[in-house]
């Protein structure tokens, strides 16, 4: 089994965090089984790496259902949607990742498919067009998105359960790291687990990726147990800083201080200097900086906070 799948929980019992969401899913699944009907359509939304795909896989495991994986941005034409829906067996789960990326011009094809399990197709040339109705077996569509606002209201309304992935706690992250380190056969004490968790941005995918890199260094350095020295060597090498910030986060903070002297700066100006797309800045670079109150948004743009200045000062002294 590939390592990523081995680390990934395969049951609700092994899934850490999202307690209310998991309880709701278990009730929905149990109800659908008792009614002998397909599970209602589900939409998960939240930041990258927080378990949306894992939850979809667990739902499929519990239902003992086939799961078909699709990337939303690849659904560009009607034929793409038809290819996904063609030849599915009853109770199949169709998982569309980044569902907000579907071409909006073909979204309507999904409406009748989700509501009535049919697709109406126009056939023939102008003047002789006919509507052919194609029946589909009952299925469950599970969507995942990092950008809920980009999903149209009509499509959102077709989902019976829209679930937000809430923030993971430090305790959640400690348990996730403990479980994953056991799978990777890494020996470490609770202090080291907490230390690694502090670099994870409370994101399971980041925590697991850090563990795999620590494993690589420990293996090459013949370390029997994981200590702080091994962890720090790993993080220094891959450019992970205190509180889990990356090199690009540090460049962003330094830019606000060194180039713009702590003044507010427009997003487009920052994007131009960093040579990064504005959406990359908004969705990837800024969230941890805003969450940790290292920068703030003002009417004039972005500005570093006192916390942000103190953070950079601490980096210099370490």
From Swiss-Prot:
<dbReference type="GO" id="GO:0005737">
    <property type="term" value="C:cytoplasm"/>
</dbReference>
<keyword id="KW-0378">Hydrolase</keyword>
<keyword id="KW-0963">Cytoplasm</keyword>
<comment type="similarity">
    <text>Belongs to the RuvB family.</text>
</comment>
<keyword id="KW-0547">Nucleotide-binding</keyword>
<dbReference type="InterPro" id="IPR003593">
    <property type="entry name" value="AAA+_ATPase"/>
</dbReference>
<dbReference type="Pfam" id="PF17864">
    <property type="entry name" value="AAA_lid_4"/>
</dbReference>
<dbReference type="GO" id="GO:0006310">
    <property type="term" value="P:DNA recombination"/>
</dbReference>
<keyword id="KW-0238">DNA-binding</keyword>
<comment type="subunit">
    <text>Homohexamer. Forms an RuvA(8)-RuvB(12)-Holliday junction (HJ) complex. HJ DNA is sandwiched between 2 RuvA tetramers; dsDNA enters through RuvA and exits via RuvB. An RuvB hexamer assembles on each DNA strand where it exits the tetramer. Each RuvB hexamer is contacted by two RuvA subunits (via domain III) on 2 adjacent RuvB subunits; this complex drives branch migration. In the full resolvosome a probable DNA-RuvA(4)-RuvB(12)-RuvC(2) complex forms which resolves the HJ.</text>
</comment>
<feature type="binding site">
    <location>
        <position position="7"/>
    </location>
    <ligand>
        <name>ATP</name>
    </ligand>
</feature>
<keyword id="KW-0227">DNA damage</keyword>
<dbReference type="InterPro" id="IPR004605">
    <property type="entry name" value="DNA_helicase_Holl-junc_RuvB"/>
</dbReference>
<dbReference type="InterPro" id="IPR008823">
    <property type="entry name" value="RuvB_C"/>
</dbReference>
<feature type="binding site">
    <location>
        <position position="52"/>
    </location>
    <ligand>
        <name>ATP</name>
    </ligand>
</feature>
<dbReference type="GO" id="GO:0009378">
    <property type="term" value="F:four-way junction helicase activity"/>
</dbReference>
<dbReference type="GO" id="GO:0005524">
    <property type="term" value="F:ATP binding"/>
</dbReference>
<feature type="binding site">
    <location>
        <position position="8"/>
    </location>
    <ligand>
        <name>ATP</name>
    </ligand>
</feature>
<dbReference type="InterPro" id="IPR008824">
    <property type="entry name" value="RuvB-like_N"/>
</dbReference>
<dbReference type="GO" id="GO:0006281">
    <property type="term" value="P:DNA repair"/>
</dbReference>
<feature type="binding site">
    <location>
        <position position="53"/>
    </location>
    <ligand>
        <name>Mg(2+)</name>
    </ligand>
</feature>
<feature type="binding site">
    <location>
        <position position="168"/>
    </location>
    <ligand>
        <name>ATP</name>
    </ligand>
</feature>
<feature type="region of interest" description="Large ATPase domain (RuvB-L)">
    <location>
        <begin position="1"/>
        <end position="168"/>
    </location>
</feature>
<feature type="binding site">
    <location>
        <position position="158"/>
    </location>
    <ligand>
        <name>ATP</name>
    </ligand>
</feature>
<feature type="binding site">
    <location>
        <position position="297"/>
    </location>
    <ligand>
        <name>DNA</name>
    </ligand>
</feature>
<protein>
    <recommendedName>
        <fullName>Holliday junction branch migration complex subunit RuvB</fullName>
        <ecNumber>3.6.4.-</ecNumber>
    </recommendedName>
</protein>
<dbReference type="Pfam" id="PF05496">
    <property type="entry name" value="RuvB_N"/>
</dbReference>
<dbReference type="GO" id="GO:0000400">
    <property type="term" value="F:four-way junction DNA binding"/>
</dbReference>
<keyword id="KW-0233">DNA recombination</keyword>
<dbReference type="GO" id="GO:0048476">
    <property type="term" value="C:Holliday junction resolvase complex"/>
</dbReference>
<feature type="binding site">
    <location>
        <position position="49"/>
    </location>
    <ligand>
        <name>ATP</name>
    </ligand>
</feature>
<feature type="region of interest" description="Head domain (RuvB-H)">
    <location>
        <begin position="242"/>
        <end position="318"/>
    </location>
</feature>
<feature type="region of interest" description="Small ATPAse domain (RuvB-S)">
    <location>
        <begin position="169"/>
        <end position="239"/>
    </location>
</feature>
<dbReference type="InterPro" id="IPR041445">
    <property type="entry name" value="AAA_lid_4"/>
</dbReference>
<feature type="binding site">
    <location>
        <position position="278"/>
    </location>
    <ligand>
        <name>DNA</name>
    </ligand>
</feature>
<keyword id="KW-0234">DNA repair</keyword>
<feature type="binding site">
    <location>
        <position position="205"/>
    </location>
    <ligand>
        <name>ATP</name>
    </ligand>
</feature>
<dbReference type="InterPro" id="IPR036390">
    <property type="entry name" value="WH_DNA-bd_sf"/>
</dbReference>
<feature type="binding site">
    <location>
        <position position="53"/>
    </location>
    <ligand>
        <name>ATP</name>
    </ligand>
</feature>
<dbReference type="InterPro" id="IPR027417">
    <property type="entry name" value="P-loop_NTPase"/>
</dbReference>
<keyword id="KW-0067">ATP-binding</keyword>
<dbReference type="InterPro" id="IPR036388">
    <property type="entry name" value="WH-like_DNA-bd_sf"/>
</dbReference>
């Amino acid at each position: 089994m590939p390592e990523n799948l081995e680390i990934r929980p395969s049951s609700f019992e092994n899934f850490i965090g999202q307690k209310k969401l998991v309880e709701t899913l278990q009730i929905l699944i149990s109800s659908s089984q008792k009614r002998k009907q397909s599970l209602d359509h589900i939409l998960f939304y939240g930041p990258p790496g927080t378990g949306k795909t894992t939850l979809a896989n667990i739902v499929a495991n519990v239902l003992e259902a086939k799961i078909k994986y699709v990337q939303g941005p690849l659904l560009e034409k009607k034929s793409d949607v038809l290819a996904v829906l063609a030849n599915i067996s009853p109770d199949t789960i169709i998982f569309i990742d980044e569902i907000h990326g579907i071409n909006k011009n073909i979204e309507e094809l999904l409406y009748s498919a989700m509501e009535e399990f049919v697709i109406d197709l126009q056939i023939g040339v102008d003047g002789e067009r006919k509507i052919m109705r194609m029946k589909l077996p009952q299925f469950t569509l599970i969507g995942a998105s990092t950008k809920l606002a980009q999903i149209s209201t009509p499509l959102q309304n077709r989902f019976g359960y829209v679930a937000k992935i809430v923030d993971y706690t430090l305790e959640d992250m400690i348990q996730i790291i403990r479980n994953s380190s056991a799978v990777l056969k890494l020996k470490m004490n609770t202090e080291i687990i907490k230390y690694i968790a502090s670099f994870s941005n409370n994101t399971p995918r980041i925590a697991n990726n850090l563990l795999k890199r620590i494993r690589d260094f420990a293996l090459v350095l013949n370390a029997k147990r994981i200590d702080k020295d091994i962890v720090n060597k790993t993080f220094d090498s891959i450019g992970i800083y205190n509180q889990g910030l990356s090199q690009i986060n540090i460049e962003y903070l330094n830019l606000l201080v060194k180039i713009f002297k702590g003044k507010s700066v427009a997003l487009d100006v920052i994007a131009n200097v960093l040579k990064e797309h504005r959406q990359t800045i908004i969705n990837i670079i800024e969230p941890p900086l805003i969450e940790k109150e290292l920068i703030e948004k003002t009417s004039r743009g972005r500005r570093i906070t006192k916390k942000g200045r103190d953070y950079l000062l601490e980096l210099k002294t370490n």
